UniProtKB/Swiss-Prot annotation:
The glycine cleavage system is composed of four proteins: P, T, L and H. In this organism, the P 'protein' is a heterodimer of two subunits. The keyword Plastid does not apply. HAMAP family: GcvPA (MF_00712). InterPro entries: GcvPA, GDC-P_N, GDC_P, PyrdxlP-dep_Trfase, PyrdxlP-dep_Trfase_major, PyrdxlP-dep_Trfase_small. This is Probable glycine dehydrogenase (decarboxylating) subunit 1. Its EC number is 1.4.4.2. Pfam families: GDC-P. It catalyses: N(6)-[(R)-lipoyl]-L-lysyl-[glycine-cleavage complex H protein] + glycine + H(+) = N(6)-[(R)-S(8)-aminomethyldihydrolipoyl]-L-lysyl-[glycine-cleavage complex H protein] + CO2.
Amino acid sequence: MLHRYLPMTEEDKKEMLQTIGVQTIDELFSDIPESVRFKGDLKIKEAKSESELLKELSQMASKNANLKEYASFLGAGVYDHYAPVIVDHVISRSEFYTAYTPYQPEISQGELQAIFEFQTMICELTGMDVANSSMYDGGTALAEAAMLAAGHTRKKKILVSSAVHPESRAVLETYAKGQHLEVVEINHKDGVTDLDVLQSEVDDTVACVIVQYPNFFGQVEKLADIEKIVHQQKSLFIVSSNPLSLGALTPPGKFGADIVIGDAQPFGIPTQFGGPHCGYFATTKAFMRKIPGRLVGQTVDSDGKRGFVLTLQAREQHIRRDKATSNICSNQALNALAASVAMTALGKQGVKEMARQNISKAQYAKRQFEAKGFTVTFAGPFFNEFVVDCKRPVKEVNDALLQKNIIGGYDLGRDYKEHENHMLVAVTELRTKEEIDTLVNEMGAIQ
């Protein structure tokens, strides 16, 4: 190209035609019959200037219900949290601005160190020994955990609580179908996994049991009781967890979890329709050589200086091919970096305070709903989400709330017929007392 930023100039076209030995564009396409060639002009709008284009796109974007102008009480896996300003600044640096894993670690020390710090912080939050460099999202991390369990135990049955995120369960079903595994759902009772049903289903054919903590309804599962049931038959205990909640809750590792997975979206990753997110995957040392995805390790170079490498690669698909522990050969490097920067900026006390505010504000919202005459469906402890009985279709309620610049909660009837007309309300640290009061009052007026 003669001009780096002006591709396909007349000079470029002439040079390319000469190189391939033809004189004109028509000669280049001479093999295409004249009868089927397009003639005339394409029916597209005239080109716009940069300022005109920005104005038009801004007008289109303004039609969306964005979280700068709307108070959001919608969670169900994607949450409106505070992201420190420094996050965007750091991840926009050219050295970091890639979603991919470095293949030349010796010249990517900064990137590898950032991933190493992500792994370290995930281990500290979950109480586990080792974490990978991240997964695509929480759903794929959950499915990969089940595949690891099935491969390790050589058993074909997977038990998953119905209180696990419905979309994560759908991803699990997709993975399991290809591996000819049986997925059995354990019903929930009073908002948490039914332990009696779980006890009756766990036998020596079960590879693993998967629960969520806090679960999809916001309730805190009794991990200590579940762990005893699971390990009686030497099945693996897998816990999907909101990492922010672990700033306040006892980490799953303390309850004997074998694998802890989840989505790091609460840390520095904005809400968005469809992703990308950042799954995390942490486990005990026993499964270190079976963990999926990239692992960054710390070492020293020939001069004795600290360095970072992609380690234990012999288990990965690009080396072991069909015998690899997983098909994933990548990670979410940029979003993992965002999560690392957010956690670092907040610090340990900041993460704890952020989690505490989620709990206190959600508790305040629950009390306000009850004072207004609403029924909060489940009575157990919860983190930042709870279920409200709307007594009418949730869609009607949300449509009315949207007119008041409020994004209402998740319609549980979409996934659970028994919870029709029930709304899953999420309250994060960003919601103010005024916003919570307005939500409750507006829903009370609709009731």
